[in-house]
Amino acid sequence: AHGASLTNIEFMQMMPGFIEPKRNLVFNEKTWRYVTFDQPVDIANEKLDDLLEQRSGYGPFTSRLASRAIDLAVDQAGAEGLALHYDFPRENVPEFVQTFATWLQDEHGIAPSDEMRVAMYAHAANGGIKIDRTAYTGVEGLYACGEATGGMHGADRIGGLSSANGIVFGRIAGASAARAALDAPEADAPVDVALPEHGIATAVAERLTRCLKHTMSAYCMINRTDAGLSKALQELESLQDEATTLNKPRANDSEIAALARLQSQIQLAAEMVKAMRKRTESLGSHYRAN
């Protein structure tokens, strides 16, 4: 509505994490080499050890390497997660393994030999608001940096660099904004702006948000297909229609905020899916199964 653009929003960092025996725990990617699967996976036994070793070298999913087969096996296990346990060496244990195993045991009561279930989590965005070398967004007076922006990570963001991104482009954005403010004409007197009055019941917003999460998890994680992405767009359109139908006038502040947040999330999700459909080849974190 204001003139800024998005870039690279089809590229997401997706990483494995625990869902059993405890949810939302980080899975240390360096420990893949010590994993034993407790259920069948569609990987030849003679290739499995090499793929696990390769997969131990980086965190987020990439379609670029053969070890994508490990992530695809996790994704194929679905919402129940892939069952596995650790078989750590008894001698010459690397320090990071000792630290991780101790943390699991002491902080969460999980022994390495316990069965665990791992699923894929959406971790961070590679894309975002498009900026130029001065951090300018294309909207007069508006500069951006950090996780809200895209373009500096590319298709594969196998490591972090979030702090470096924020520091480097934060400095650039701050300096650019300061120069623009010095050159800008004096602002006009503020005018009264009509605030929105329509909102949506909190319970309804929570239900529609759960539906939104389900749609994006089902069709827009690792295994992306044209049919699945088309289905996602249909479901998002239905959610937007339902949010419009169920909103109400003279809402309270919480309900107004809930509607604005929900509609923005649905709109962003739809733009992400369109970008995923448009890119028909696999590239970096974007994997097209067909």
Predicted feature locations:
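C-terminal amphipathic alpha-helical interaction region
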Residues: 252-290
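A conserved FAD-binding loop/helix module that cradles the flavin
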Residues: 2, 151-177
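Long, amphipathic alpha-helical stalk/connector segments used for oligomerization, subunit docking
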Residues: 180-255
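A glycine-rich phosphate-binding loop feature that marks nucleotide/adenosyl-phosphate handling sites
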Residues: 13-20, 119-125, 186-198, 286-289
